[in-house]
């Protein structure tokens, strides 16, 4: 909604705009003069951002002379349709996560920089706890968070060295990406080794854990949880990424939830 209001308040036609429109030879001089002096005089009614809405309910109402309303119609629909879509999907995903934090990492797959930036804002409105989009964080004052990439791991001679260096740089927010080579045979043993070294060195393990970005996340998360618990790190965070939607998240949580027998034996 903020973007809609900013657009309408700033809408005007400068000399370059008017010269281009005139060159098309499809508008008469009276219309071009009208555009030169254009100022939106209508009223806009809208529900507050973040309000739950249902299909076929009006989100925004524009009351204005028909010429003014038609000039702003396409832009309003373009802004609202995309961001409502992102906010709605984010809300569904966050609801499926049942209170676990959901991060927005969508910039690289967005339809252009503006879509990625405003999509990040919409995702936070929908319930996401933060974004990897630093520009969105600066513009909209939303939390900026993230981990390291596979390229970080591959830039070092081996996985352990990459993990150790990252832990030195970010000891209070140490989330290690364990699936670059082999999650269970390489990534997890190396991550656990680094966590043990941090603990032995007296470094507080305030926020730490692993991230998985590939494979059968439901199956792997259960295996990973067991490895962390057996190594003495029951409070380590397990985070997942890569094409997660509400259905996959629900499946992962269902698969990894302890059964009554698990609870009895634990």
Task: Kindly give the residue locations of the regions a language model identified.
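Intrinsically disordered, low-complexity, positively charged segments
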Residues: 1-22
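Buried, small/hydrophobic-residue-enriched core segments of structured protein domains
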Residues: 26, 32-41, 49-54, 59-234, ...
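Structured beta-strand/loop patches that form or line metal/cofactor-binding pockets in enzymes
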Residues: 44
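Conserved small/polar residues in nucleotide/adenosyl-binding loops
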Residues: 255-260
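N-terminal low-complexity segments that are often proline-rich with Ser/Thr-Pro
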Residues: 263-266
């Amino acid at each position: 909604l903020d973007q809609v209001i900013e657009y309408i308040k700033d809408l005007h036609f400068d000399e370059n705009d008017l010269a281009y429109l005139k060159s098309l030879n499809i508008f008469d001089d009276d219309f071009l003069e009208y555009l030169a002096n254009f100022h939106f005089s209508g009223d806009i009614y809208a529900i507050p951002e973040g309000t739950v809405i249902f299909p076929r309910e009006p989100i925004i109402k524009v009351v204005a002379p028909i010429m003014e309303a038609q000039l702003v119609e396409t832009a309003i629909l373009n802004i609202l349709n995309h961001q409502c879509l992102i906010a709605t999907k984010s809300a569904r995903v966050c609801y499926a996560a049942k209170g676990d934090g959901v991060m927005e990492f969508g910039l690289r797959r967005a339809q252009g920089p503006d879509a990625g930036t405003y999509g990040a804002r919409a995702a936070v409105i929908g319930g996401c706890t933060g974004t990897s989009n630093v520009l969105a964080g600066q513009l909209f004052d939303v939390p900026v968070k993230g981990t390291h990439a596979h390229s970080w791991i591959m830039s070092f001679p081996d996985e352990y060295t990459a993990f150790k260096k990252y832990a030195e740089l970010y000891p209070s927010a140490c989330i290690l990406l364990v699936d670059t080579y082999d999650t269970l045979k390489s990534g997890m043993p190396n991550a656990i080794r680094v966590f043990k070294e941090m603990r032995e060195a007296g470094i507080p393990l305030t926020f730490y854990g692993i991230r998985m970005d590939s494979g059968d996340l439901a199956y792997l998360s259960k295996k990973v949880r067991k490895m962390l618990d057996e190594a003495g790190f029951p409070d380590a965070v397990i985070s997942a990424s890569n094409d997660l939607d509400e259905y996959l998240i629900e499946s992962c949580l269902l698969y990894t939830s302890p059964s009554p027998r698990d609870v009895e034996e634990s």
